[in-house]
Regions:
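A general structural signal for short secondary-structure boundary/capping elements
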Residues: 38, 92-96, 121
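C-terminal alpha-helix
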Residues: 110-121
Length: 121
């Protein structure tokens, strides 16, 4: 709660799974209450779809529903489900250094570029 009171904006990473949508609804409700009482300038920087597996209907459904609700707040960059992303923290190394050529690392680099482009616009 303290972080939401102090923040200007929130980047919401969202696993492309059903229960994550419930957590997202709770977070949005909490943000609404914080905005109403303590931090009227709090906004959503963006929603980042993570752990996305395009081979599953659920992943596609969650991505579609989130895009319909949040529209342009959803980043175009999607972080795929990727083994190398899961391995990197166990070695204490950022994913972009652990395996810079992995799909996951490339996605995070693309996210950084997208965030910078949004801020410049």
């Amino acid at each position: 709660l303290n972080a939401l009171v102090a923040a200007d904006a929130v980047l919401i990473p969202l696993h492309c799974e059903y229960f994550a949508l419930e957590g997202l609804a709770d977070l949005v409700g909490t943000m609404r209450r914080v905005r109403g009482a303590l931090n009227p300038s709090l906004e959503i920087e963006g929603v980042l779809l993570t752990m996305y597996d395009d081979r599953t209907n659920l992943g596609q459904l969650v991505a579609r529903d989130v895009r319909e609700f949040f529209k342009d707040k959803v980043f175009n960059t999607i972080i795929p489900r990727n083994v190398r992303l899961g391995e990197a923290p166990s070695h204490g190394i950022p994913a972009v250094l652990y395996d810079a050529k992995s799909r996951g690392a490339a996605a995070y680099v693309a996210l950084a570029r997208e965030m910078l482009a949004r801020r410049a616009a």
